[in-house]
Amino acid sequence: MRGFVILDFGSQFTQLIARRLREMGFYSEIHSFEYPTEEIRKKNPYGIILSGGPNSVYEAGSPQRNVAELRNISPVMGVCYGMQLLTHQLGGKVTRAEHREYGLNYVTWSSPVQGVPERQKVWMSHGDVVEKAPEGFKIIANSDGHHPAAMQGPGVLAVQFHPEVAHTDHGMDLLKYFAQGMCKAPADWDAPHIKDILIKEAQDKVGPTDHVLVGLSGGVDSTVVATLLTKALGAERVHCVFVDNGLLRKNEYEAVLESYHRIGLNVRGVDASEEFLSALQGKSDPEDKRKTIGRVFIEVFDKSYDHKLPIKWLAQGTLYPDVIESVSSVGGSVTIKSHHNVGGLPEKMKLGLVEPVRELFKDEVRALGAQLGLPKEMLWRHPFPGPGLAIRVLGEVTKEKLQILKEADDVYISELRRRGLYEKIWQAFCVLLPVKTVGVQGDSRTYDHVLALRAVTSSDGMTADWYPFEFQFLREVSNLITNKVKGVNRVVYDVTSKPPGTIEWE
């Protein structure tokens, strides 16, 4: 699909640029700053955006790009490092700032931009500044530090701040000005369009006769994938497997399997809990656990279907943030953790891999699911990781620890639902810590587990803030858990945002 190409120079905010453009209806995709010019030309993008990055354009080994070539393809926007790169390569001058501009600042526009006020609050993060704009360019905004904050030239817009972050006021308006005002792009990226595109892509990739095996987890992503493929290929060619890996929440296997039958999926339930728990025995490293679970899933799938059927593909609900978190970028991003749908898969798969929603964010998947007719209660379940409770039991996974965690999680989530808080929260769960503490229960000394409660708000899983529960709620839930769940005598609440933490603990 025609849209915008975002070249990643290593900024932690690059994904937000894509996110913001899509929110406004403009399709966008992220590529390395080294993405070949000819490949960009083939995509015929409406516009090209150069992201920010941690480097200086003068540093040896800093990411570089021939921006003159890009200008011959479509309008170009530079953000932070992208502005410095444009200046440096087009004959302007970039120097080290005497005082670094970081965090909230204000800029004043000398030339009006549609939708953006003359004085604008922005988020900055840079140590270099533009001293002289390239020939033919005009400085159109300055910071309170008297440095150029934006410039414009033929087919080029560049800003020395981050319009994509929420801290920047009217940042969306600035991106919209580039997308519509300069690039004349139509805002045609929406759920009906996404559905039509993905159905056709699935039909083209799988072909007219091949069958697909879908591993269902009970979560939104795999459910939407199975429904989409069923719509595209027909239920007789889409074979869903829902595995009881022993790592699901309390009573989840039976309830979810029934809901799958109700929406018309061709699904088979498989009890493989002993296989998973046996494989996880003695493993405490989170990466080891994830990859072990990925391996066993493939082994279970391989035994769960009729090999006489022409099944050639394995489908997964991998999302864009999963891919982003699992791929190291030359521009400066680093691998955070392997995702169970990416790094956790064995290299020698017997089936090809199809990931229909790989380029979508979570809210886009939910919108797609609604377009496909899935009920609200299935679409708004909190995200649940493929490795399940194995990465919420820190350290080695045992049946005893899983039982404790299942009971505690059931108490916690039930209280959230009862008090009308569940739908206000992006994701909530319990984590069983690998430590025990001394306590007193019923006049007796105890030495039991510590349980952490986690609840975050987010729009796409890329960033997240901890949910500000009232203290009375935390007091009451803590009392309920320590009274009802044998094996827990201390409850703590995680008040870490993402970043610096990830949403899951492992």
Swiss-Prot record:
The active site is at 80 (nucleophile), 162, 164. Keywords: ATP-binding, Glutamine amidotransferase, GMP biosynthesis, Ligase, Nucleotide-binding, Purine biosynthesis. Its EC number is 6.3.5.2. CDD domains: GATase1_GMP_Synthase (cd01742), GMP_synthase_C (cd01997). It is an enzyme of class 6 (ligase). One of its GO terms (molecular function) is ATP binding. Pathway: Purine metabolism; GMP biosynthesis; GMP from XMP (L-Gln route): step 1/1. Homodimer. Catalyzes the synthesis of GMP from XMP. This is GMP synthase [glutamine-hydrolyzing]. The gene is guaA.
